[in-house]
Amino acid sequence: MDRIRIVGGNQLHGVIPISGAKNAALPLMIASLLTDDTLTLENVPHLADVEQLIRILGNHGADISVNGRRERQGESYARTIHFTSRNIVSTTAPYELVSKMRASFWVIGPLLAREGKARVSLPGGCAIGTRPVDLFIEGLTALGANIEIDGGYVNATAPEGGLTGGRYVFPKVSVGATHVLMMAATLANGTTVIGNAAREPEVADLAKCLNAMGAKITGAGTGTITIEGVRSLSGARHRVLPDRIETGTYAMAVAMTGGDVILEDTEASLLDTALEAIRRAGAEISETNSGIRVVRNGAGIRPVDIVTDPFPGFPTDLQAQFMGLMTKSSGVSHITETIFENRFMHVQELARLGAKISLSGQTAKIEGVGRLKGAPVMATDLRASVSLVIAGLAAEGETMVSRVYHLDRGFERLEEKLTRCGAHVERVSD
Protein backbone atom coordinates (compact mmCIF):
# COMPACT_ATOMS: atom_id res chain seq x y z
CA MET A 1 0.00 0.00 0.00
CA ASP A 2 1.33 3.45 -0.91
CA ARG A 3 2.36 6.06 1.63
CA ILE A 4 3.44 9.69 1.31
CA ARG A 5 6.81 10.61 2.82
CA ILE A 6 7.41 14.27 3.65
CA VAL A 7 10.57 15.92 4.95
CA GLY A 8 9.47 19.30 6.25
CA GLY A 9 11.18 22.65 6.50
CA ASN A 10 11.27 23.88 2.90
CA GLN A 11 9.45 26.93 1.61
CA LEU A 12 7.40 26.61 -1.57
CA HIS A 13 8.40 28.62 -4.66
CA GLY A 14 7.14 28.19 -8.20
CA VAL A 15 3.99 27.47 -10.16
CA ILE A 16 1.24 24.96 -9.40
CA PRO A 17 -1.36 24.24 -12.10
CA ILE A 18 -4.84 23.76 -10.66
CA SER A 19 -6.80 20.80 -11.98
CA GLY A 20 -10.42 20.61 -12.97
CA ALA A 21 -12.76 20.33 -9.99
CA LYS A 22 -13.65 16.84 -8.89
CA ASN A 23 -16.84 18.16 -7.31
CA ALA A 24 -17.86 19.60 -10.68
CA ALA A 25 -16.64 16.72 -12.86
CA LEU A 26 -18.64 14.01 -11.09
CA PRO A 27 -22.15 15.50 -11.58
CA LEU A 28 -21.20 16.55 -15.12
CA MET A 29 -20.23 12.97 -15.94
CA ILE A 30 -23.49 11.69 -14.47
CA ALA A 31 -25.43 14.20 -16.57
CA SER A 32 -24.27 12.31 -19.67
CA LEU A 33 -26.93 9.69 -18.83
CA LEU A 34 -29.63 12.25 -19.66
CA THR A 35 -28.96 12.13 -23.41
CA ASP A 36 -28.35 9.53 -26.12
CA ASP A 37 -25.95 11.99 -27.76
CA THR A 38 -22.28 12.57 -26.88
CA LEU A 39 -21.27 14.80 -23.98
CA THR A 40 -17.63 15.88 -24.17
CA LEU A 41 -15.98 17.14 -20.99
CA GLU A 42 -12.64 18.95 -21.02
CA ASN A 43 -10.24 19.48 -18.10
CA VAL A 44 -11.34 16.32 -16.28
CA PRO A 45 -8.89 15.46 -13.46
CA HIS A 46 -7.24 12.06 -13.23
CA LEU A 47 -8.57 10.84 -9.87
CA ALA A 48 -9.66 7.56 -8.32
CA ASP A 49 -13.23 8.85 -7.94
CA VAL A 50 -13.39 9.78 -11.63
CA GLU A 51 -12.15 6.32 -12.62
CA GLN A 52 -14.72 4.69 -10.34
CA LEU A 53 -17.53 6.74 -11.87
CA ILE A 54 -16.37 5.78 -15.36
CA ARG A 55 -16.87 2.14 -14.33
CA ILE A 56 -20.32 2.91 -12.95
CA LEU A 57 -21.44 4.76 -16.08
CA GLY A 58 -20.14 1.89 -18.18
CA ASN A 59 -22.34 -0.43 -16.14
CA HIS A 60 -25.34 1.57 -17.35
CA GLY A 61 -24.26 1.31 -20.98
CA ALA A 62 -22.21 4.45 -21.53
CA ASP A 63 -19.53 4.28 -24.20
CA ILE A 64 -16.57 6.28 -22.87
CA SER A 65 -13.37 7.36 -24.60
CA VAL A 66 -10.52 9.28 -23.02
CA ASN A 67 -8.11 11.57 -24.83
CA GLY A 68 -5.34 12.56 -22.45
CA ARG A 69 -2.47 14.92 -23.09
CA ARG A 70 0.34 15.86 -20.79
CA GLU A 71 0.23 19.62 -20.39
CA ARG A 72 3.60 20.06 -18.64
CA GLN A 73 6.47 17.68 -18.17
CA GLY A 74 6.25 16.05 -14.77
CA GLU A 75 2.97 17.63 -13.77
CA SER A 76 -0.69 16.76 -14.17
CA TYR A 77 -2.91 15.50 -16.92
CA ALA A 78 -5.84 17.48 -18.23
CA ARG A 79 -8.12 15.04 -20.00
CA THR A 80 -10.93 15.27 -22.47
CA ILE A 81 -13.50 12.50 -22.03
CA HIS A 82 -16.37 11.67 -24.38
CA PHE A 83 -19.50 10.05 -22.94
CA THR A 84 -22.16 8.49 -25.17
CA SER A 85 -25.11 6.76 -23.48
CA ARG A 86 -27.04 5.80 -26.60
CA ASN A 87 -28.80 2.95 -24.83
CA ILE A 88 -29.25 2.49 -21.10
CA VAL A 89 -28.62 -1.23 -20.61
CA SER A 90 -29.20 -1.26 -16.85
CA THR A 91 -31.11 0.98 -14.45
CA THR A 92 -29.55 -0.75 -11.44
CA ALA A 93 -26.49 0.70 -9.71
CA PRO A 94 -25.22 -2.21 -7.61
CA TYR A 95 -23.79 -2.12 -4.12
CA GLU A 96 -20.32 -3.25 -5.17
CA LEU A 97 -19.96 -0.09 -7.29
CA VAL A 98 -21.96 2.53 -5.38
CA SER A 99 -20.57 1.59 -1.97
CA LYS A 100 -17.14 2.88 -2.97
CA MET A 101 -18.18 6.48 -3.67
CA ARG A 102 -21.13 8.48 -2.42
CA ALA A 103 -21.55 10.63 -5.54
CA SER A 104 -22.36 7.54 -7.61
CA PHE A 105 -25.77 7.55 -5.91
CA TRP A 106 -26.57 10.62 -8.01
CA VAL A 107 -27.24 8.45 -11.09
CA ILE A 108 -30.71 7.98 -9.60
CA GLY A 109 -31.81 11.35 -11.02
CA PRO A 110 -30.89 10.89 -14.70
CA LEU A 111 -31.93 7.21 -14.76
CA LEU A 112 -35.33 8.00 -13.27
CA ALA A 113 -35.90 10.96 -15.59
CA ARG A 114 -34.82 9.20 -18.79
CA GLU A 115 -35.88 5.59 -18.18
CA GLY A 116 -38.69 6.04 -15.66
CA LYS A 117 -37.06 3.80 -13.08
CA ALA A 118 -33.89 3.34 -11.07
CA ARG A 119 -32.62 0.89 -8.48
CA VAL A 120 -29.61 2.35 -6.71
CA SER A 121 -27.70 1.04 -3.72
CA LEU A 122 -27.40 3.26 -0.69
CA PRO A 123 -24.09 5.11 -1.04
CA GLY A 124 -20.56 4.89 0.34
CA GLY A 125 -17.56 7.25 0.21
CA CYS A 126 -15.90 9.14 3.05
CA ALA A 127 -17.14 8.17 6.50
CA ILE A 128 -18.17 11.68 7.54
CA GLY A 129 -21.28 11.56 9.69
CA THR A 130 -24.45 9.96 8.42
CA ARG A 131 -25.02 12.01 5.24
CA PRO A 132 -28.56 10.63 4.71
CA VAL A 133 -30.35 10.39 1.37
CA ASP A 134 -33.65 11.71 2.73
CA LEU A 135 -33.38 15.01 0.84
CA PHE A 136 -32.84 13.19 -2.46
CA ILE A 137 -35.92 11.05 -1.86
CA GLU A 138 -38.13 13.96 -0.80
CA GLY A 139 -37.05 16.06 -3.78
CA LEU A 140 -37.70 13.32 -6.34
CA THR A 141 -41.02 12.50 -4.67
CA ALA A 142 -42.02 16.13 -5.25
CA LEU A 143 -41.62 15.40 -8.98
CA GLY A 144 -44.04 12.49 -8.74
CA ALA A 145 -41.62 9.63 -8.18
CA ASN A 146 -42.64 6.63 -6.11
CA ILE A 147 -39.71 5.60 -3.93
CA GLU A 148 -39.15 2.68 -1.56
CA ILE A 149 -36.07 1.51 0.30
CA ASP A 150 -35.64 -2.23 0.44
CA GLY A 151 -32.64 -4.44 1.12
CA GLY A 152 -30.16 -1.57 1.05
CA TYR A 153 -31.45 -0.26 -2.27
CA VAL A 154 -33.50 2.78 -3.22
CA ASN A 155 -36.14 1.72 -5.75
CA ALA A 156 -37.60 4.66 -7.67
CA THR A 157 -40.24 4.70 -10.40
CA ALA A 158 -41.80 7.56 -12.31
CA PRO A 159 -45.54 7.71 -13.03
CA GLU A 160 -46.78 6.81 -16.49
CA GLY A 161 -45.88 9.70 -18.73
CA GLY A 162 -42.78 10.59 -16.74
CA LEU A 163 -41.86 12.92 -13.93
CA THR A 164 -43.88 16.08 -13.44
CA GLY A 165 -42.54 19.48 -12.49
CA GLY A 166 -43.15 20.57 -8.92
CA ARG A 167 -41.91 22.82 -6.16
CA TYR A 168 -39.56 21.64 -3.45
CA VAL A 169 -37.82 23.65 -0.73
CA PHE A 170 -34.86 21.90 0.87
CA PRO A 171 -35.08 22.00 4.68
CA LYS A 172 -31.28 22.25 4.68
CA VAL A 173 -28.85 23.04 1.91
CA SER A 174 -27.54 19.97 0.05
CA VAL A 175 -25.21 20.21 -2.92
CA GLY A 176 -25.71 16.60 -4.00
CA ALA A 177 -29.49 16.69 -3.71
CA THR A 178 -29.57 19.98 -5.65
CA HIS A 179 -27.55 18.33 -8.45
CA VAL A 180 -29.88 15.33 -8.57
CA LEU A 181 -33.15 17.24 -8.49
CA MET A 182 -31.94 19.71 -11.12
CA MET A 183 -30.88 16.90 -13.46
CA ALA A 184 -34.13 14.99 -13.01
CA ALA A 185 -36.22 18.12 -13.56
CA THR A 186 -34.67 18.83 -16.96
CA LEU A 187 -36.75 16.01 -18.49
CA ALA A 188 -39.85 16.42 -16.30
CA ASN A 189 -43.16 17.64 -17.68
CA GLY A 190 -43.71 21.27 -16.74
CA THR A 191 -41.79 23.62 -14.49
CA THR A 192 -39.84 22.78 -11.34
CA VAL A 193 -38.81 25.31 -8.71
CA ILE A 194 -36.10 24.35 -6.20
CA GLY A 195 -36.00 26.48 -3.06
CA ASN A 196 -33.08 26.78 -0.64
CA ALA A 197 -30.91 25.34 -3.40
CA ALA A 198 -27.16 24.99 -2.99
CA ARG A 199 -25.33 28.01 -4.42
CA GLU A 200 -21.96 26.36 -4.95
CA PRO A 201 -20.06 27.15 -8.18
CA GLU A 202 -20.26 23.46 -9.09
CA VAL A 203 -24.08 23.72 -9.17
CA ALA A 204 -23.88 26.68 -11.54
CA ASP A 205 -21.34 24.80 -13.66
CA LEU A 206 -23.67 21.82 -13.98
CA ALA A 207 -26.54 24.11 -14.98
CA LYS A 208 -24.33 25.77 -17.59
CA CYS A 209 -23.56 22.38 -19.13
CA LEU A 210 -27.19 21.23 -18.99
CA ASN A 211 -28.31 24.43 -20.71
CA ALA A 212 -25.72 23.80 -23.43
CA MET A 213 -27.39 20.40 -23.85
CA GLY A 214 -30.77 22.07 -24.36
CA ALA A 215 -32.12 22.37 -20.81
CA LYS A 216 -33.93 25.50 -19.64
CA ILE A 217 -32.51 26.36 -16.24
CA THR A 218 -32.38 29.77 -14.59
CA GLY A 219 -31.22 30.88 -11.16
CA ALA A 220 -28.41 28.36 -10.66
CA GLY A 221 -25.95 29.86 -8.22
CA THR A 222 -28.77 31.48 -6.25
CA GLY A 223 -31.09 30.05 -3.62
CA THR A 224 -33.92 29.50 -6.11
CA ILE A 225 -33.49 27.47 -9.29
CA THR A 226 -36.21 27.20 -11.93
CA ILE A 227 -36.19 24.40 -14.51
CA GLU A 228 -38.59 24.23 -17.43
CA GLY A 229 -38.68 20.62 -18.55
CA VAL A 230 -37.85 19.66 -22.14
CA ARG A 231 -38.58 16.50 -24.12
CA SER A 232 -34.94 15.56 -24.66
CA LEU A 233 -31.38 16.78 -24.31
CA SER A 234 -28.63 16.76 -26.92
CA GLY A 235 -24.87 16.49 -26.70
CA ALA A 236 -22.54 19.35 -25.82
CA ARG A 237 -18.93 20.25 -25.12
CA HIS A 238 -18.09 21.69 -21.71
CA ARG A 239 -14.93 22.57 -19.77
CA VAL A 240 -14.86 21.62 -16.08
CA LEU A 241 -14.29 24.65 -13.86
CA PRO A 242 -11.12 24.93 -11.71
CA ASP A 243 -10.96 23.09 -8.40
CA ARG A 244 -11.51 25.69 -5.66
CA ILE A 245 -10.70 23.14 -2.95
CA GLU A 246 -7.35 22.31 -4.53
CA THR A 247 -6.74 26.05 -4.95
CA GLY A 248 -7.41 26.72 -1.27
CA THR A 249 -5.36 23.72 -0.20
CA TYR A 250 -2.21 24.88 -1.98
CA ALA A 251 -2.77 28.47 -0.86
CA MET A 252 -2.80 27.21 2.74
CA ALA A 253 0.31 25.13 2.09
CA VAL A 254 2.19 28.27 1.03
CA ALA A 255 0.86 30.16 4.05
CA MET A 256 2.02 27.27 6.24
CA THR A 257 5.57 26.93 4.90
CA GLY A 258 6.22 30.43 3.62
CA GLY A 259 7.21 31.11 0.03
CA ASP A 260 5.87 32.53 -3.22
CA VAL A 261 3.68 30.44 -5.53
CA ILE A 262 1.49 31.15 -8.54
CA LEU A 263 -1.64 28.98 -8.63
CA GLU A 264 -2.41 28.76 -12.35
CA ASP A 265 -5.69 28.16 -14.17
CA THR A 266 -7.93 29.08 -11.25
CA GLU A 267 -10.19 31.95 -10.17
CA ALA A 268 -10.22 33.84 -6.87
CA SER A 269 -13.99 34.39 -7.12
CA LEU A 270 -14.54 30.67 -6.54
CA LEU A 271 -13.30 30.88 -2.94
CA ASP A 272 -13.36 34.50 -1.76
CA THR A 273 -14.21 33.62 1.86
CA ALA A 274 -11.40 31.10 2.19
CA LEU A 275 -8.85 33.41 0.58
CA GLU A 276 -9.83 36.19 2.97
CA ALA A 277 -9.24 33.86 5.93
CA ILE A 278 -5.79 32.99 4.55
CA ARG A 279 -5.01 36.71 4.14
CA ARG A 280 -6.02 37.33 7.74
CA ALA A 281 -3.66 34.54 8.75
CA GLY A 282 -0.76 36.49 7.24
CA ALA A 283 -0.42 35.57 3.56
CA GLU A 284 -0.46 38.08 0.73
CA ILE A 285 -2.86 37.04 -2.04
CA SER A 286 -3.28 38.76 -5.39
CA GLU A 287 -4.82 37.92 -8.73
CA THR A 288 -2.65 37.44 -11.81
CA ASN A 289 -3.41 37.04 -15.50
CA SER A 290 -3.24 33.26 -15.12
CA GLY A 291 -4.58 32.72 -11.61
CA ILE A 292 -3.64 33.63 -8.03
CA ARG A 293 -0.33 34.51 -6.37
CA VAL A 294 0.21 33.53 -2.73
CA VAL A 295 3.15 34.93 -0.76
CA ARG A 296 4.24 34.68 2.85
CA ASN A 297 7.68 36.00 3.64
CA GLY A 298 8.85 36.70 7.17
CA ALA A 299 5.54 37.41 8.88
CA GLY A 300 4.26 34.77 11.27
CA ILE A 301 0.91 32.99 11.06
CA ARG A 302 -1.87 34.82 12.88
CA PRO A 303 -4.78 33.01 14.59
CA VAL A 304 -8.10 33.25 12.75
CA ASP A 305 -11.52 31.96 13.80
CA ILE A 306 -13.73 30.41 11.11
CA VAL A 307 -17.15 28.80 10.83
CA THR A 308 -17.89 26.45 7.94
CA ASP A 309 -21.00 27.27 5.95
CA PRO A 310 -22.55 26.52 2.56
CA PHE A 311 -21.25 28.67 -0.29
CA PRO A 312 -20.39 31.54 -0.23
CA GLY A 313 -19.25 30.73 3.33
CA PHE A 314 -16.04 28.98 4.32
CA PRO A 315 -16.03 25.53 2.64
CA THR A 316 -16.23 22.50 4.89
CA ASP A 317 -13.86 20.80 2.44
CA LEU A 318 -11.12 23.25 3.49
CA GLN A 319 -11.73 23.01 7.23
CA ALA A 320 -9.14 20.31 7.93
CA GLN A 321 -6.48 22.11 5.89
CA PHE A 322 -7.13 25.39 7.70
CA MET A 323 -6.84 23.60 11.03
CA GLY A 324 -3.43 22.39 9.92
CA LEU A 325 -2.46 25.99 9.18
CA MET A 326 -3.71 27.20 12.56
CA THR A 327 -1.56 24.69 14.45
CA LYS A 328 1.40 26.98 13.67
CA SER A 329 -0.32 30.28 14.51
CA SER A 330 0.90 32.66 17.18
CA GLY A 331 -2.21 32.34 19.36
CA VAL A 332 -5.53 30.59 19.89
CA SER A 333 -8.05 30.02 17.10
CA HIS A 334 -11.43 28.33 16.88
CA ILE A 335 -12.98 26.34 14.05
CA THR A 336 -16.69 25.53 14.13
CA GLU A 337 -18.02 22.85 11.76
CA THR A 338 -21.68 23.32 10.82
CA ILE A 339 -22.01 21.06 7.76
CA PHE A 340 -21.03 17.59 9.02
CA GLU A 341 -21.30 16.32 12.57
CA ASN A 342 -18.17 14.16 12.55
CA ARG A 343 -15.50 15.99 10.60
CA PHE A 344 -12.76 16.29 13.19
CA MET A 345 -11.20 12.86 12.71
CA HIS A 346 -7.91 14.50 11.72
CA VAL A 347 -7.48 16.09 15.17
CA GLN A 348 -5.82 13.09 16.83
CA GLU A 349 -3.46 12.66 13.88
CA LEU A 350 -2.42 16.34 13.94
CA ALA A 351 -1.80 15.88 17.66
CA ARG A 352 0.79 13.21 16.79
CA LEU A 353 2.77 15.99 15.09
CA GLY A 354 2.61 18.13 18.22
CA ALA A 355 -0.56 20.14 17.61
CA LYS A 356 -2.58 21.27 20.65
CA ILE A 357 -6.27 20.90 19.78
CA SER A 358 -9.28 20.39 22.03
CA LEU A 359 -12.87 19.70 21.01
CA SER A 360 -16.13 20.95 22.45
CA GLY A 361 -19.10 19.76 20.40
CA GLN A 362 -18.69 21.04 16.87
CA THR A 363 -15.96 23.53 17.75
CA ALA A 364 -12.22 22.90 17.82
CA LYS A 365 -9.88 25.10 19.86
CA ILE A 366 -6.39 25.25 18.38
CA GLU A 367 -3.50 26.58 20.45
CA GLY A 368 -0.69 27.46 18.09
CA VAL A 369 2.64 25.81 18.81
CA GLY A 370 6.14 26.97 18.02
CA ARG A 371 7.02 23.87 16.09
CA LEU A 372 5.61 20.63 14.77
CA LYS A 373 7.65 17.45 14.67
CA GLY A 374 7.31 14.77 12.01
CA ALA A 375 5.71 11.45 12.90
CA PRO A 376 3.84 8.54 11.31
CA VAL A 377 0.19 9.55 10.77
CA MET A 378 -2.84 7.93 9.17
CA ALA A 379 -5.33 9.53 6.79
CA THR A 380 -8.96 9.09 7.82
CA ASP A 381 -10.71 10.73 4.87
CA LEU A 382 -9.96 12.78 1.76
CA ARG A 383 -9.62 16.27 3.22
CA ALA A 384 -8.10 15.09 6.50
CA SER A 385 -5.35 13.34 4.55
CA VAL A 386 -4.21 16.51 2.81
CA SER A 387 -4.26 18.45 6.09
CA LEU A 388 -1.63 16.01 7.34
CA VAL A 389 0.47 16.63 4.25
CA ILE A 390 0.28 20.40 4.80
CA ALA A 391 1.27 20.02 8.43
CA GLY A 392 4.10 17.69 7.43
CA LEU A 393 5.50 20.32 5.08
CA ALA A 394 6.02 22.64 8.06
CA ALA A 395 7.07 19.98 10.58
CA GLU A 396 10.65 19.23 11.55
CA GLY A 397 11.92 15.93 10.23
CA GLU A 398 10.02 13.15 8.48
CA THR A 399 6.27 12.67 8.35
CA MET A 400 4.88 9.47 6.84
CA VAL A 401 1.21 9.54 5.82
CA SER A 402 -0.44 6.15 5.38
CA ARG A 403 -3.77 5.24 3.73
CA VAL A 404 -3.13 7.76 0.96
CA TYR A 405 -5.76 6.17 -1.26
CA HIS A 406 -7.94 8.87 0.31
CA LEU A 407 -5.69 11.50 -1.30
CA ASP A 408 -5.93 9.82 -4.69
CA ARG A 409 -9.70 10.27 -4.61
CA GLY A 410 -9.44 14.06 -4.75
CA PHE A 411 -5.95 15.41 -5.47
CA GLU A 412 -4.32 14.93 -8.85
CA ARG A 413 -0.56 14.27 -8.64
CA LEU A 414 -0.19 16.15 -5.38
CA GLU A 415 3.35 14.99 -4.67
CA GLU A 416 4.56 16.05 -8.13
CA LYS A 417 3.05 19.51 -7.86
CA LEU A 418 4.56 20.13 -4.43
CA THR A 419 7.96 18.70 -5.38
CA ARG A 420 8.27 21.08 -8.32
CA CYS A 421 7.91 23.95 -5.84
CA GLY A 422 10.72 22.73 -3.61
CA ALA A 423 8.95 20.44 -1.16
CA HIS A 424 10.46 17.09 -0.20
CA VAL A 425 7.44 14.87 -0.88
CA GLU A 426 7.49 11.41 -2.38
CA ARG A 427 5.23 8.41 -2.75
CA VAL A 428 6.64 5.18 -1.40
CA SER A 429 5.29 1.64 -1.68
CA ASP A 430 5.52 -0.99 1.03
UniProtKB/Swiss-Prot annotation:
<comment type="pathway">
    <text>Cell wall biogenesis; peptidoglycan biosynthesis.</text>
</comment>
<keyword id="KW-0961">Cell wall biogenesis/degradation</keyword>
<feature type="binding site">
    <location>
        <position position="317"/>
    </location>
    <ligand>
        <name>UDP-N-acetyl-alpha-D-glucosamine</name>
    </ligand>
</feature>
<dbReference type="InterPro" id="IPR005750">
    <property type="entry name" value="UDP_GlcNAc_COvinyl_MurA"/>
</dbReference>
<dbReference type="GO" id="GO:0051301">
    <property type="term" value="P:cell division"/>
</dbReference>
<keyword id="KW-0670">Pyruvate</keyword>
<keyword id="KW-0133">Cell shape</keyword>
<dbReference type="GO" id="GO:0005737">
    <property type="term" value="C:cytoplasm"/>
</dbReference>
<feature type="binding site">
    <location>
        <position position="339"/>
    </location>
    <ligand>
        <name>UDP-N-acetyl-alpha-D-glucosamine</name>
    </ligand>
</feature>
<keyword id="KW-0963">Cytoplasm</keyword>
<dbReference type="InterPro" id="IPR050068">
    <property type="entry name" value="MurA_subfamily"/>
</dbReference>
<dbReference type="GO" id="GO:0019277">
    <property type="term" value="P:UDP-N-acetylgalactosamine biosynthetic process"/>
</dbReference>
<feature type="binding site">
    <location>
        <begin position="172"/>
        <end position="175"/>
    </location>
    <ligand>
        <name>UDP-N-acetyl-alpha-D-glucosamine</name>
    </ligand>
</feature>
<dbReference type="InterPro" id="IPR036968">
    <property type="entry name" value="Enolpyruvate_Tfrase_sf"/>
</dbReference>
<keyword id="KW-0573">Peptidoglycan synthesis</keyword>
<dbReference type="GO" id="GO:0009252">
    <property type="term" value="P:peptidoglycan biosynthetic process"/>
</dbReference>
<feature type="binding site">
    <location>
        <begin position="131"/>
        <end position="135"/>
    </location>
    <ligand>
        <name>UDP-N-acetyl-alpha-D-glucosamine</name>
    </ligand>
</feature>
<comment type="function">
    <text>Cell wall formation. Adds enolpyruvyl to UDP-N-acetylglucosamine.</text>
</comment>
<dbReference type="GO" id="GO:0071555">
    <property type="term" value="P:cell wall organization"/>
</dbReference>
<keyword id="KW-0132">Cell division</keyword>
<comment type="similarity">
    <text>Belongs to the EPSP synthase family. MurA subfamily.</text>
</comment>
<dbReference type="GO" id="GO:0008360">
    <property type="term" value="P:regulation of cell shape"/>
</dbReference>
<feature type="active site" description="Proton donor">
    <location>
        <position position="126"/>
    </location>
</feature>
<dbReference type="InterPro" id="IPR013792">
    <property type="entry name" value="RNA3'P_cycl/enolpyr_Trfase_a/b"/>
</dbReference>
<feature type="binding site">
    <location>
        <position position="102"/>
    </location>
    <ligand>
        <name>UDP-N-acetyl-alpha-D-glucosamine</name>
    </ligand>
</feature>
<dbReference type="Pfam" id="PF00275">
    <property type="entry name" value="EPSP_synthase"/>
</dbReference>
<dbReference type="InterPro" id="IPR001986">
    <property type="entry name" value="Enolpyruvate_Tfrase_dom"/>
</dbReference>
<protein>
    <recommendedName>
        <fullName>UDP-N-acetylglucosamine 1-carboxyvinyltransferase</fullName>
        <ecNumber>2.5.1.7</ecNumber>
    </recommendedName>
</protein>
<keyword id="KW-0131">Cell cycle</keyword>
<keyword id="KW-0808">Transferase</keyword>
<dbReference type="GO" id="GO:0008760">
    <property type="term" value="F:UDP-N-acetylglucosamine 1-carboxyvinyltransferase activity"/>
</dbReference>
<feature type="binding site">
    <location>
        <begin position="22"/>
        <end position="23"/>
    </location>
    <ligand>
        <name>phosphoenolpyruvate</name>
    </ligand>
</feature>
<feature type="modified residue" description="2-(S-cysteinyl)pyruvic acid O-phosphothioketal">
    <location>
        <position position="126"/>
    </location>
</feature>
